[in-house]
Structure formats: C-alpha cells, structure tokens
Amino acid sequence: MHGDTRDQSTPVAHTVDPAVAESAGRMDSDTRTDPAMPSPRASGAVRTESSESQASTAQAPAAPPATDQPATAARQPGAEEDLTAAPRRRTTSTRRTTATAATRRAAEPGSAAADAEPPARKRAAGKSTTKTATAKTGTKTATKPSARKTTESDTVIGRIPVLDVSPQIDAGRRPAKAVVGETFLVTATVFREGHDAVNANVVLRDPRGRSGPWTPMRELAEGTDRWGAHITPTAPGRWSYLVEAWSDPIATWRRTAGVKLPAGIDTALVLEEGARLLEQAAAGVPKKEGRAHVLAAVDALRDPGLPPLSRLAAALAPEVLELLARYPLRELLSASRPLPLQVDRERALFGSWYEFFPRSEGAVVDPNGVEPPRSGTLRTAAERLPAIAAMDFDVVYLPPVHPIGRAFRKGPDNTLTAGPHDVGSPWAIGSPEGGHDAVHPDLGTIEDFDHFVAEARALHLEVALDFALQCSPDHPWVNKHPEWFSHRADGTIAYAENPPKKYQDIYPINFDQDMDGIVKETVRILRFWMSHGVRIFRVDNPHTKPVVFWEKVLSDIARTDPDVVFLAEAFTRPAMMHTLAKIGFHQSYTYFTWRNTKNELTEYLTELTGDAAAYMRPNFFANTPDILHAFLQQGGRAAFAIRAVLAATLSPSYGVYAGFELCENEPAHPGSEEYLHSEKYELRPRDWNRTDTLAPLLTVLNRLRRRHPALQQLRDLRFHPTDNDQVLAYSKNATTPEGLTDQVITVVNLDPHHVQEATVTLEGDGPHVVHDELTGAVYTWGRHNYVRLDPSAEPAHLLTVRRNPT
C-alpha cells in the first residue's frame, strides 16, 4: 500500500464514542474513493469483528476503528466517494454534537466508518441534528498495518457477530488469490441474539483502497447462520475484502407485520412503526433512483381509508423491496477486519501448455549411429511454433536452454558414462561457456532466443522457461562461490541424490551460508530472462530449496513485475506444496498423474476445488519428460485420449509434453515411469506428419476451453452420480460476458480397454438440449441419462449446455 494521500479537508461534525475517537488512527494507505457510486451506510461507526483471534501482519490491511455503540460517520466535504450504492442508517435522537479531531480521523475516507457513509445523503458541516448513544471502551486501533498489535478489538465480539470469514489464508497473514474477472464465494457466520433479522454484505476494496462494489450476502441454508456472496475483482493488484453485518429493522418489521396484521393484533401501531422505518429509509434513496416509490409506501401505510393488508401490500411492492435492498436501513453495523486478496492476470489460472525440447526440433540423428548427431537450434525450434499454435495452445514451455556441463555428463537413458557425442541433460546447467544467463552454443545465441520469443508472440503464444536452480560441476559458480555448495568430509562437493536416484552431474545449492547472495543472483538471472520476453517460469524442484528463499525471490519480482507467473514443479508432500502456493507461486504441479480411478479423481478434485482453491492453482500435466505413468504405458491410444480429456476439462491449466500426441509410451523397463530413449539425455526428432496423431483431439479440447468460461475456472466443479465405477461424470458452470449460463458436462470412460455403459444422474429440472463437442451429436438430457462409451472410438462426451439465467 502507498502512503496516506487522502483529502485533509475538515470533516462534517458527527458523534463517535470518545474512547474510540481518542484511539482511532489513520489507515496507512491511499483510501480515496471514486465519486461515481456510493457505499453502504450504517447507523453507527463500524465495529471490527476480531473474535476469531487472527493475527495481522504488514501484509494485511489495517482494521477499522471499533465501538460498541452507534455513531454517525460523516463524509469529508470534497472527498472522493465510494463506488457503490449506500444503505441508509437509522438515527435515534436529535441533538447537535461536535466532533473532536480524533473523531474526524476515525471517519476519514478509507476508515470503516467513512466507507459506510453514503454520499447521496450528505449533510453540511454543522447542520447535523443527530445524536447517538455512546459508551466508553478500551478499544484501540493501530495507526499502521505493520505496527498493528493485539487489542481489545482482536478479542471482543462485535455487536452483530461476524465470524469465520472465508476464504482466509493463515489467519489473514497471507492473501487469498484470484485472477481478473474470476468470481469466488466469500462466506461468514452472522447472527444475533433474539429474533430480530440480520443482514450482511461483502465490501471489496481495490488496490487503491477504494471500496466497492458492496455485494449483498444471503444465508446459504436456512437456519445455519452461514452467509455468502460471490465477488469478482476487475483488475490486478493487492485487493482486500471484509464482511459487514447489521441488524435489519425493516426486515424485522416485515416479518412482524406479516404475522400481526392478518390476526388483527396492534394493527395501527404496527403500520405506524413501518411508516416511520420506511420514512427514514426513504431519506437515503436518491430522488433519481426512485425515492418517490418509498414515500408512496409511507403514505399508504398511513392511509386510514385503505384496508390494513392493502396498506401492508404497498410496503411490500416489488419496486419498494428492490430499492430498499439497494439502499437498506442498517443498525448496529459490525465488520470483520479486512482480509488481503492478490489478484493476478488470467494466465495465472488458465492456459494450455505445450512442452518441447528445442534441441530435438531440426535435429539430425543417424539411425545407424555412424555419423554424430546434430542438434536442432532455437531457429529450427521456432519452425515448430505454427503447429503448436494451430492446436490452440497458449504457452510453449522450454526446458533449460543453458550450456550443459561435461563433468559426469550422463549418457543415454541416464547411463553414467557419456560418449563423445552425447548431449547430456539440460538440467545439468553450466560449463565454461556460461551458466544460467547463457544460451547453449548448440542452440544458438541470445539473439536466436529473442527471435524464438518474437515468433511465439506473433502466434499469440507465451514462452515459459524452465528455471532449475542447480549446477553442473563445470558451472562458473563452483569456482566463484564455493560457499554456495555442500562439501563432504573429503572436501568434494556433494552431488544431488533422491534415493535410489543419483545425479552425479548436478550439484545442489546450499542456501545457509549466503542466502542473501543467492537471492540477489537468482533475482538477477530471472530479470535477465524477463528482459528477453519471458513472463512465465516453470521452477524445477522448488521443494528442495528453503521456503523463505522463494518468498524473498518471488516478492522481489512481484514488487516490480506482478504479471510474471511462476509454476512450481513440486511433486512432494502436501504441506510443502500448499506452503509454496501460499508464499507466492501462482501454480503448482499436482498428483493428477497418479489419480486414475473414479474415487481417486473425485476425492482429489474435491480437495483442489475446495478451500485450497483460494490459494493453490493446479496445472494438470498429462505427461512430462520424467513421468510416463503405467496407465499410458498399458492403455494405448485410448488412455492418452482419456487423460487428455480429464486434464483439459478438470483443471483450468493443463499441459502435455511433446510426443503425447503421438502416444509415445515405451518405458525404460517394466515398472519404470521413465521413457525408453529419454529425451532428457538424447536428441529425439519426431515425424509430425504421422496420421495417427492425437493433435485433432488436443485442438478440439483447446478450442473448447477458449470458448467456454466454465472450463477456465477451478472453483465451480460438481461431480454427478453414475452407476458404473468406470464412468466419471462432472460439470462446470460459469456466466458468459453476455449474461448466459455456460455449462459443460463431461462424461469419461476411465477404462481404456472396454466399452462401458452407465446412467448419469443430474440434479435439477430437464430436459435440456446438449451438444457433444467431440462428435457433433445432439441429445436431449434430463435427470437420468444413459451413456455408452467406446474407448476405441470416443471415450468421452463433452456436452455443452447454454441457458438464460434464471
């Protein structure tokens, strides 16, 4: 957040609890607001709800002032206004009061009290005639987020409790995540004593601290006290959100009137109480928005010539209900403390990735082994880009392009002895020709790399570069920075091991001798490649480096280049994977490769699309140069098609490694997940003109993903019952820019060897006309639907449904 640059003009007089006013501090951010739209208004200063005992750090926005009693929160003359429509506050008495300087600070724009003040109902300074009850309280508010200490407001429940706000990452110490235009659900527990009605809304604050739009919440299930609303950030940056709750006197009156008037109980009194409430609310409805409708209802409630139920009906007219929903009358306003939200660009969530080794494109290999192989170059690799773009991929991902060490170089299939012409592993980085900021001479020059990036960009492809923070024994760092490596008892540098695997050609980094130096060098290298057009990095094995190291590196990059995306290749324990996501990685590899049965997929995707979706975004690679799963080895072409459909429709980001479309599935040996003739250790030119390619299927999947917003999001995934464990059915839903409901239903045969039949059960009413994007067939589907899927033909249905919103 930036320094306090708010309007310093004199605020309108108002009343606030003196104890609160004395301790109220200014939020350390630019909280000026847009004059276009007002924000919710309340009958009192907002109380911070902190009974969840959630610690706050410099990353979290400062909490608003807290008070037990209602207070007028006046807007400064000339200050910019909030972005949303403003609910009306209810006043309780009429005596002029004067604000203290501390009180004025508490009501500055950006404080919760100021955010609650509606610009549509401004009063001139010195003209206020309202009085509110006050009571002394020991509540304090820190002046800066970084200096915020635990106070009474951290432990005392507000007048209207607001508890368990979600999403909330590490008690608010880390931001929840979304991308521009992504809609997600905010929930909270809201209730009060007795039977009076409560209501709630979410306030979303943009990176400049402007509040709006506020979004009404609803009780998710009657009697649960759990409220929710969907919000959608519209620009990248660090946002925040909070939940406001209040006592709703008009809703309480409606409920009472609906019982008493038909029974003839207290008829005149009930009608007059309603008239007074609506009269107060009408003052908060702008004339141009329809204030006259509310005033007409007031007149009807007081019209003795009308029957009581007709007078009530006027107050319940649709236009009156709609206006008071937009401009509610709020009492006893309470609020959660603001929670941070990091909003990234779309590619952080959605994209189709294609990985290939540039040295194999244009390579020449003598099948008889007589002539030495000739490596492809970045220029010849660029010739492959049009075919990748034609399949509608979004990202082309390159393994390391740096010089490869010669010491302990690996031979074919990871053999320990390399021949004179063996090319080695690209992950054994560094030679006398250079390190992480150099291009392998066989691939060309940095100018050739720039050409590759430019060609990709012209085809609307982004380039992702592998970043592997490790060295070959020949890397310049070995001599320049020996303290960056671990040394064994005999003085030699320890090579990498992941028992039973040994990587004698790779030296891992030791971060504990000079972490600051390694951070500085890492940031320099990343910025070097960023200056050459790379805005996505796939980070190799980040789980083998300290989390705090990555936090330092990623925060440094995000400070100036928040559009740069980092994918964590972390096949590791859940705690590490989730923590890497929380500290700044935008995406993560997952266990998708090893989830193949109906139960495995359902359970795993339920986990990923649940609470974890607020901070961890999966990228489902169907294969990698390291992993050829037994399902692909044994299932043939149908298995590849099945896994492609699953990856492309379950996750908004997915990828394949070159050769997937050719169904390459020969393992190094039985039981191995390594490829025979692994491209990690040798050149592998391919015949892309083969007719048995899966490229047409990948193209259909990628085009479908681009056309359907439902497939571009993670959180709204629903599994549907089937009566066959070999048939998996699920759907995704989203709203299109045109306001239509976009739904994609996927039904997959998980058995690559046999035809499977099942009945798919869908919730809701039918029938609906659905279109199969794979075959072009059109079906009418209702609640129970028969399917028959032949893996040798089409192993899945990809059904699209479009309806007008209800």
Q: Residue locations for each model-derived region?
A:
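Short, acidic/polar
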Residues: 376-387, 514-529, 639-644
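Substrate-binding cleft/loops of secretory-pathway carbohydrate-active enzymes
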Residues: 472-483, 550, 558-559, 571-599, ...
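Hydrophobic faces of well-ordered beta-strands that scaffold small-molecule active sites
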Residues: 352-354, 396-398, 463-465, 537, ...
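Catalytic-core region of carbohydrate-active enzymes that cleave or remodel glycosidic bonds
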Residues: 554-569, 574, 596-670, 736
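Short, solvent-exposed turn/loop segments enriched in Gly/Ser/Thr/Pro and often Arg
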Residues: 397-406, 467-476, 540-546, 569-573, ...
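Aromatic- and acidic-residue-enriched carbohydrate-binding clefts of CAZyme catalytic domains
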Residues: 347-376, 404-452, 479-516, 676-684
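Carbohydrate-interacting/catalytic domains
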Residues: 1-52, 56, 61-63, 68, ...
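Active-site neighborhood of glycoside hydrolase catalytic domains
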Residues: 479, 483, 487, 510-580
